[in-house]
Amino acid sequence: MTDEPADLLLRDPAYVARLLPLLRLATKWWFRSEVRDIDRIPDGGALVVSNHSGGLMAMDVPVIAVAFFDHFGEDRPLFVLAHDMLFTGPAEPVFQRAGFLKATRANADAVLQSGGVTIVFPGGDYDTFRPYTKNNTVDFAGRTGYVRTALANDVPLVPVVSIGGQEAQLHLSRGEQLAKLLQLERLLRTRYMPVTFGFPFGLTFAFPPNLPLPTKIVTQVLEPIDVRAEFGDDPDIAEVDAEVRRRMQAVLDDLASARRFPVLG
């Protein structure tokens, strides 16, 4: 893997503008999405740190993106640090034009140093394939690189918490053993082959993906965190990560307690 940053100009604002009506329809009509306090994302560069839900049909990015562009306007660029799996085959230019970048430190630095906003999901595939018993748990699988990235680029962390996306289908297992048997880490850089149950295919092993249920997705943007101001010039990375997750978990717990029924919200 190269350490050279991707070309940020591959993002096509006109293409993003054409996608937005479709994304708005999907997020607002099917998922009844609600994003609270999007205005907390400050001007300039910022690293948006979110939990990740929905498996192969994760809707975190469309939900956040629609709210972001509706509030800040389409002229403010938004980038997403994503798994290598999205950049294989003919799908690569599609995601690049939408502002997706491989989740590397070089790409994060390039966006943040340009004054841009980028979304990162530290938990990645581990998080989005979590079983239903962990639906309302913030777990980054021990990954703390996002803290170092914010420090290196002197930008705030903006925690974001979402609930409902993991209810789009029933996630039974991450399928680690199956993925190991199929050598998916070597082929696709993932250790998981999720076992899910949904409509119309019933029990599936990642493919074919089931139609996501119209679960209500509620997303809360937390107050930005100036890491140096709160933790000092040379903070303990693990301490910062633990505090970020603690704040996110507290909000997720509140959202879960306010949620009356699965899927319905």
Predicted regions and their residues:
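Non-catalytic C-terminal accessory region of glycerolipid acyltransferases
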Residues: 1-16, 109-265
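Hydrophobic alpha-helical segments of integral membrane proteins
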Residues: 18-22, 26, 91-94
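Helix-to-loop junction immediately C-terminal to a conserved catalytic motif
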Residues: 22-52
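Short, structurally constrained coil/turn elements
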Residues: 29, 72-74, 213
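A broad, low-specificity signal marking well-ordered, structured residues that form hydrophobic/aromatic
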Residues: 33, 46, 78, 118, ...
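Residues in well-ordered beta-strands of folded domains
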Residues: 36, 49, 81, 121, ...
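Catalytic core of membrane glycerolipid acyltransferases/transacylases, capturing the structured
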Residues: 42-108, 114, 124-141
